Amino acid sequence: MHSSALLCCLVFLTGVRASPGQGTQSENSCTHFPGSLPHMLRELRVAFGRVKTFFQKKDQLDSMLLKESLLEDFKGYLGCQALSEMIQFYLEEVMPQAENHDPDIKEHVNSLGEKLKTFRLRLRRCHRFLPCENKSKAVAQVKNAVSKLQEKGVYKAMSEFDIFIDYIEAYMTMKTQN
């Protein structure tokens, strides 16, 4: 078992343990989740701010990668799946490649990835925010474009990470209002 998967399992199991006379920590954290959302998004933005200039300078493409269609998927019935797929895409495909582009930014990209993993873990604990199964065409288009662009695709995806955070915020705002 990979050490990161083992760590996630341990964190999950620790959060599930019931406190005497109370619901689980997971249930309690879910009631506070909407209130902690602005702080979590701010942490993502601050972490991205440490690498934003590097990747935006390297991004030589004029086209947008994260288009309005992705935001519409986030806001529509595919919102859950689009969010889940995009988080997975950044964690498994974009960030591992981005870490290898410059030793000076590796630590910062890694930190950004850890914050995104923590965010995903909290979303999964609170099932009403991430209960999904369907696939998003907009996410498939983003993945396809990055794959075709190769190294330039990594720069593009990382340079637009702030847009991704904005889309997360739009999705979470919609979910907390429902």
Curated annotation (Swiss-Prot):
Gene Ontology CC terms, in alphabetical order: extracellular space
MF term (GO), any: cytokine activity
Residues making up the signal peptide according to the UniProt record: 1-18
Keywords, sorted A to Z: Cytokine, Disulfide bond, Glycoprotein, Secreted, Signal
Annotated Gene3D superfamilies: 1.20.1250.10
Glycosylation sites recorded in the entry for this protein: 134
One Pfam family recorded for the sequence: IL10
Compartments, record wording: Secreted
One BP term from GO: positive regulation of cytokine production
Domain of life assignment: Eukaryota
Annotated SMART domains: IL10 (SM00188)
Main location: secreted
Bilayer-crossing regions: none
Keyword flag Glycoprotein: yes
Keyword Disulfide bond: yes
Subunit and interaction comment: Homodimer. Interacts with IL10RA and IL10RB.
Similarity-based family: Belongs to the IL-10 family.
PANTHER family to which the protein is assigned, alphabetical: INTERLEUKIN-10, INTERLEUKIN-19-RELATED
The protein's role, per its UniProt record: Major immune regulatory cytokine that acts on many cells of the immune system where it has profound anti-inflammatory functions, limiting excessive tissue disruption caused by inflammation. Mechanistically, IL10 binds to its heterotetrameric receptor comprising IL10RA and IL10RB leading to JAK1 and STAT2-mediated phosphorylation of STAT3. In turn, STAT3 translocates to the nucleus where it drives expression of anti-inflammatory mediators.
Name the record gives this protein: Interleukin-10
Record lineage: Eukaryota, Metazoa, Chordata, Craniata, Vertebrata
